């Protein structure tokens, strides 16, 4: 099927592949080389992590309002408010559900945006860190096997948990390495079609 502006028909023998794609074109080779660089992989993983984290954070924030643990908005909380006002006798917090609809929506969207952005930053950091480390390890070892993902997972987990001390870094290393090994092993399984 041909679409307007798209080349159609079969490729001549020995020439370009179907659709006008020539794998020997120097521009295509340059683009492939750029996309295979560690920098490009890290940036793409960080961007994909940011997008996925934003959607995930928005979804989780939308589910948080039906729990009794959600902190309601109170008068006097916000920029310039006195946090000690909660200890004043007679001070009663205003429940979110008793506010006007416009205020509820304003609070809900603001909270969703903050949570979504926070989750997006975290996913981007994890994705970029793991991808960059894995690509670096793959370049050093000159192999593409399960060991790269396990080592990258260990280093990523340890780096993310470094502020918790050496024990937290060891647990982070073990957890990320195990998760990475499980996902990588599943991704490398032969398909049912093979």
Swiss-Prot record:
A Pfam family reported for this protein in Swiss-Prot or TrEMBL: Tim17
Transmembrane segments: 43-63, 145-161, 167-187
Major location (coarse): mitochondrion
Disulfide bond residue pairs: 38-135, 154-173
Subcellular location: Mitochondrion inner membrane
Coiled coil: none
Biased composition (Gly residues): 1-18
Membrane topology: Multi-pass membrane protein
Record key words, sorted: Disulfide bond, Membrane, Mitochondrion, Mitochondrion inner membrane, Protein transport, Translocation, Transmembrane, Transmembrane helix, Transport
GO aspect biological process, one term: protein insertion into mitochondrial inner membrane
A GO cellular-component term linked to this record: TIM22 mitochondrial import inner membrane insertion complex
Gene Ontology molecular function: mitochondrion targeting sequence binding; protein transmembrane transporter activity; structural molecule activity
Residue ranges of the region described as Disordered: 1-24
Family stated for the protein in its record: Belongs to the Tim17/Tim22/Tim23 family.
Functional note: Essential core component of the TIM22 complex, a complex that mediates the import and insertion of multi-pass transmembrane proteins into the mitochondrial inner membrane. In the TIM22 complex, it constitutes the voltage-activated and signal-gated channel. Forms a twin-pore translocase that uses the membrane potential as external driving force in 2 voltage-dependent steps.
Record's subunit section: Component of the TIM22 complex, whose core is composed of TIM22 and TIM54, associated with the 70 kDa heterohexamer composed of TIM9 and TIM10 (or TIM8 and TIM13).
Protein name: Mitochondrial import inner membrane translocase subunit tim22
Lineage: Eukaryota, Fungi, Dikarya, Ascomycota, Pezizomycotina
Annotated gene: tim22
């Amino acid at each position: 099927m041909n679409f307007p502006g798209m080349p159609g028909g079969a490729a001549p023998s020995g020439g370009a592949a179907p659709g006008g794609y020539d794998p020997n074109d120097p521009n295509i080779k340059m683009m492939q080389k750029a996309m295979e660089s560690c920098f490009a992989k890290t940036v793409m993983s960080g961007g994909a992590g940011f997008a996925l984290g934003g959607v995930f954070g928005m979804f989780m924030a939308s589910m948080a309002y039906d729990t009794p643990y959600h902190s309601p908005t109170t008068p006097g909380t916000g920029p310039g408010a006195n946090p000690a006002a909660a200890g004043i006798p007679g001070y009663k917090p205003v429940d979110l559900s008793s506010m006007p609809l416009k205020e509820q929506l304003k609070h809900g969207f603001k909270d969703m945006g903050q949570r979504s952005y926070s989750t997006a930053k975290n996913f981007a950091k994890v994705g970029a860190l793991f991808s960059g480390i894995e690509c670096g390890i793959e370049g050093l070892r000159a192999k593409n096997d399960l060991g790269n993902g396990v080592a990258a997972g260990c280093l990523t987990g340890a780096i993310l948990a470094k502020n918790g001390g050496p024990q937290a870094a060891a647990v982070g290393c073990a957890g990320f390495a195990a998760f990475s090994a499980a996902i990588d092993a599943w991704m490398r399984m032969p398909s049912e079609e093979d």
